[in-house]
Amino acid sequence: MPVACNVVTHGMRVTGVDSSPSLIALCRERLPDQEWIVADMRGFRHARTFDGIVAWDSYFHLGPDDQRSMFEVFAAHARHHTILMLNTGPAFGEAVGNYRGDPVYHASLDSNEYRGLLARYDFELIEHSIEDPQAGGRTVWLARGR
């Protein structure tokens, strides 16, 4: 939600996707003029492409195979110069963390594999920052569609 608020504050439109109906309901309440869709991002298909695609604090909750498959989803919704921004873990692995007392799954691929997926799906890497302190310690990927 904070990412969407920031985008809207800068005069842009948001199409938000989440598998949680209650989270989408909250988004519709707080930002009613935007498009909110209840869907699993792994199977998301929209009739149009976007100027920007952001998978922030969501993508790394997918398993390694689903993360690989998501690049097809990203590419299907990108066009020339679409910006793709996502965050991952710093290295290959899987872990179960804790958020407010609930277990939370995290997974990441190896940095070289992410680089390969970006290239394979025609994204040019602009910036990669591992455990970026300005992003709360997140590992950030910023790319552009070619």
Regions found by a protein language model. Give the residues of each.
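Class I SAM-dependent methyltransferase SAM/SAH-binding core
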Residues: 1-43
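A conserved beta-strand element that flanks and buttresses the S-adenosyl-L-methionine
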Residues: 54-55
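A short His-aromatic
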Residues: 61-62
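A short glycine-rich, Lys/Arg-flanked "PGG" loop and its adjoining helix->strand segment in the class I
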Residues: 68-80
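Conserved beta-strand signature within the Rossmann-like core of class I S-adenosyl-L-methionine
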Residues: 81-88
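Short "lid" loop at the C-terminus of a central beta-strand within the Rossmann-like core
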Residues: 89-94, 131-133
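Acceptor-substrate binding/catalytic loop of class I
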Residues: 96-113
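Core SAM-dependent methyltransferase catalytic element
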Residues: 129-146
